[in-house]
């Protein structure tokens, strides 16, 4: 029955009961029969409103949105785009704690240098020289990782109250102004730590975090000052492995990355120095779980901090939630020679949240999801396979869209039919470009 029709009938019943109750009474209190009728009518109306189907399809602008991997933000200042994060009441971001992970990577490198000081200064000049592969100068995660390395090694220079994350080009003479020489005292001996070179790994087409560019960079650096390079630090494993396979593996120069990609973890047995797991298994789960909860109309914490009916739940040592930022962050773990065997398969779902949902309470829904760059090693070889493992468990039919890593239009041109989907999981090319997607959903 039409909701408006039901309410009209209920209203008529209230009026009839009220007239009957007022026939001979002069009391200022409503008659008992009137109270009963009013309460019954109110209960009927509430039940009808709850049970009645919505008047037509849900507007695209009101459907759940999960930003992931690239947090909507100003690529210059890092300021969060709260308009995008509050696009509607069912909008969230899923990523990882960038600062915690960045500091962990920097400390992992510093600890390795101290533990291997006898062999790490390859030319015996008392200078521990390192090169740094920067992913994207406008990406918050890349900025944090560059700062984390420079902070731990004492090479950072403050600018506007923060460590300057700028690439320096070549700095073999230590004259660059965006970094400084650090000092380490190990076994009573003082060593200088110098960032010999760093650059943003962007290819000619504009794609950042580019592994091939990193491979070319290490070849150029090695040809010019290879005997001075004692350590390689990379903002991610894709670039790190390109440099490792291209030069540092043969030269036995420890290389450190980020993401715990399967090939990088396996390479630790061959001399790769270490990497950071950003708990992609937890991130991928959260990406789909938040839209699942919104679609089901349950508390957003269901199956996250609070166990669901299937027993899925996360503990607070693997994630955190910032309500003001509407953001879920996975916590990071260092992967080294001591524990790498536990991380060899990065596509295995996280056991505590690997239980199948019941289709009776979580029916099949259709989700549009894009990967900003189909060639990105971490997203294509780790994150997407995890998403594909979780989508079945969460009863979600997901259409996966792979971008070219260069332009938003390469992705948004394939979002011409948003009405066909129940929710959207968005991975932008650039963190500034949230409006490219929300404008489509708002039409």
Predicted feature descriptions by range:
Residues 22, 26-443:
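A residue-level marker of the well-folded mature domains of exported/periplasmic proteins
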Residues 1-10:
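Bacterial Sec-dependent N-terminal signal peptides
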Residues 16-19:
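Bacterial Sec-type N-terminal signal peptides, specifically the leucine/valine-rich hydrophobic h-region
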């Amino acid at each position: 029955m039409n909701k408006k029709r039901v309410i009209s009938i209920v209203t008529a019943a209230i009026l009839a009961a009220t007239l009957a109750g007022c026939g001979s009474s002069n009391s200022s209190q409503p008659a008992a029969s009137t109270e009963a009728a009013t309460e019954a009518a109110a209960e009927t109306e509430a039940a009808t409103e709850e049970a009645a189907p919505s008047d037509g399809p849900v507007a695209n602008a009101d459907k759940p949105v999960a930003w992931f991997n690239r947090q909507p933000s100003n690529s210059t200042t890092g300021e969060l785009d709260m308009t995008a994060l509050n696009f509607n009441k069912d909008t969230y971001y899923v990523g990882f704690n960038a600062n915690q992970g960045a500091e962990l990577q920097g400390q992992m490198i510093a600890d390795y240098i101290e533990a291997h000081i006898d062999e790490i200064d390859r030319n015996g000049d008392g200078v521990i020289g390192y090169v740094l592969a920067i992913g994207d100068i406008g990406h918050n995660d890349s900025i944090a990782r560059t700062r984390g390395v420079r902070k731990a090694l004492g090479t950072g220079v403050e600018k506007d109250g923060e460590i300057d994350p700028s690439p320096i080009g070549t700095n073999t003479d230590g004259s660059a102004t965006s970094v400084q020489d650090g000092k380490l005292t190990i076994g009573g001996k003082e060593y200088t730590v110098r960032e010999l070179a760093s650059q943003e790994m962007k290819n000619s087409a504009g794609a950042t975090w580019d592994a091939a560019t990193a491979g070319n960079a290490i070849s150029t650096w090695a040809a010019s000052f290879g005997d001075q390079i004692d350590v390689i630090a990379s903002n991610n494993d894709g670039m790190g492995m390109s440099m490792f396979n291209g030069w540092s593996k043969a030269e036995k120069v420890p290389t450190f990355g980020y993401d715990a990609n399967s090939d990088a973890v396996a390479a630790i047995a061959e001399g790769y120095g270490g990497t950071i797991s950003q708990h992609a298994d937890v991130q991928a789960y959260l990406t789909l779980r938040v839209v699942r909860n919104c679609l089901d109309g349950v508390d957003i914490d269901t199956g996250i901090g609070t166990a669901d009916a299937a027993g899925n739940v996360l503990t607070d040592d693997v994630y955190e939630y910032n309500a003001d930022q509407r953001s879920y962050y996975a916590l990071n773990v260092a992967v080294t020679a001591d524990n790498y065997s536990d991380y060899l398969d990065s596509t295995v779902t996280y056991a505590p949240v690997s239980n199948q949902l019941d289709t009776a309470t979580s029916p099949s829904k259709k989700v549009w999801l894009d990967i900003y760059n189909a060639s990105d090693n971490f997203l294509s070889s780790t994150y997407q396979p995890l998403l594909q493992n979780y989508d079945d468990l969460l009863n979600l039919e997901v259409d996966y869209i792979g971008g070219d890593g260069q332009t938003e239009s390469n992705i948004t041109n394939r979002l011409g039919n948003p009405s066909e989907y129940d929710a959207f999981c968005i991975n932008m090319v650039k963190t500034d470009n949230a409006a490219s997607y929300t404008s489509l959903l708002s039409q």
